[in-house]
Amino acid sequence: MNKSILTFAFLASSASLISMGAAAETTISGNISSKCSVFTDTVGVYGNPSPDELSTLVADGGIQPIIRYDVSIADYYTAKISWPNSFTTSPNLTDALNWDGEIEVHNTSDAGMSGYEAAKVEYENVTEYDLSVAGSTWFKVTSEVTYGVDKSLPGGEYKASVEALCIAN
């Protein structure tokens, strides 16, 4: 009889566990490394070819910034580069600034990238390139700014930033 009671008690507790059910929450995680990296290869410097102008062109005494994109998988990324349209640092300026600029392919690691320049998309101060070939591409940036109408820029430090993004398609 004790054996029957023990067996019944065991079966009842097992049935109770089965009817209650069990639940678990399992986490799935992962880390993704970007297959597109952006680097500054050459820092830009403004030349001052005339009292009212700053320019990164070599002919104007400047140094054009060079931005490098390294892409390990083709057709998944877009380079989005903006030439400056404001100063991040400057003396107090009381007149209008007129900005102009250009982004161009400077060098490539693969001959298949030769069509990048012809296929670029430009709007406002932004240039986009479809990075359709794996490898490295160097872009040079031209930045020019004039101050007022025949008005001299005040002495002091001037800085502007190029924004270079790698956008996943």
What kind of region is each of these model predictions?
Residues 93-100, 116-121:
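Low-complexity "stalk/linker" and mucin-like segments enriched in Ser/Thr/Pro/Ala/Gly
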